[in-house]
Structures are given as C-alpha cells and as structure tokens.
Design a protein with these regions (language model features):
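RNase H catalytic domain
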Residues: 15-19, 58-138
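N-terminal intrinsically disordered, compositionally biased regulatory/targeting segments
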Residues: 1-3, 97, 140
Length: 140
C-alpha cells in the first residue's frame, strides 16, 4: 500500500449578510497537482463573518482528514483568522474562542500545516461558493 504523505491545499471563505446575519461557507480542496478534490457551498445559519470564516476552516480540516491528508496548506482572505491561528493576534471574542480551539485541536492531527493570508481576489473560488450559498438562501 502506498503511504506517500498526502498534501492538500484548502481554500476557505465565510460570508455573512448582516454581521451577524444569514451566513455561509465556501471550501475548495485541491490535491498536490492542483486538481480540485472537493467543493463545499453551504449555509450555516446566523453567524458573524468571523464565525463563518472559522466554520469554513473547521469544515475544510474535517474533510481533509477524511481524504487522508497528512499536510494541509490553508489559504484564507481573513487576515484576522490567519493571524490568530499563527499566534500573532489574540482571540478576544468569546464567540470565536471555541471555534479557534477546535481549529487548533484539528491542526494538531496533521503532520504539518501552512496558514496563508491571501488577497480576496486570489480566493475567488471559495468566496463564490460562500456567496452562492447565501444567494440560494436569500432566494428560497
């Protein structure tokens, strides 16, 4: 059996209309060759933008684990979330702390991870998935 370490790239985005308000997530998981392995576009109920961002990441990490990832490379346009996970910013919001702890616990299950803050225009695929879920919610 081939036990080559599996490295996946996780692009995540959360969106909220109202902040807090109706919220949704977008996740794109790609393999080592850049091929899309999984996409998630889902509403998550009422949440803030930051709660939605964290929920997107939790979902992506859970799916990456199911796909057998050993290493994950995370891309997000949320500077706050990226800096909190890297330990550069403190988590002060009581609603974010349990989500942050869940992310940290999940990350500990991987051999390694990278966290990258990227411009929104470079996260357009995950952003579109989150907004598509919100649009579907608003039109139903």
């Amino acid at each position: 059996m081939d036990k080559t370490p599996r490295r996946l790239t996780l692009s995540v985005d959360g969106a909220s209309r109202g902040n807090p308000g109706p919220a949704a997530i977008g996740v794109v998981i790609k393999d080592e060759k850049g091929a899309t392995t999984l996409k998630v576009s889902s509403s998550i109920g009422r949440a803030t933008n930051n709660q939605a961002e964290y929920t997107a990441l939790i979902t992506a990490l859970r799916e990456a684990r199911k796909l057998g990832a050993d290493h994950v490379d995370i891309r997000t346009d949320s500077q706050l979330m990226a800096e909190q996970i890297l330990g550069h910013y403190k988590v002060r919001n009581a609603n974010i702390k349990p989500l942050f702890e869940e992310v940290k616990q999940s990350l500990a299950g991987f051999k390694s991870y990278g966290m990258h803050h990227i411009p929104r225009e470079r996260n357009s695929e995950a952003d579109a998935l989150a907004n598509d879920a919100l649009d579907t919610l608003n039109n139903s």
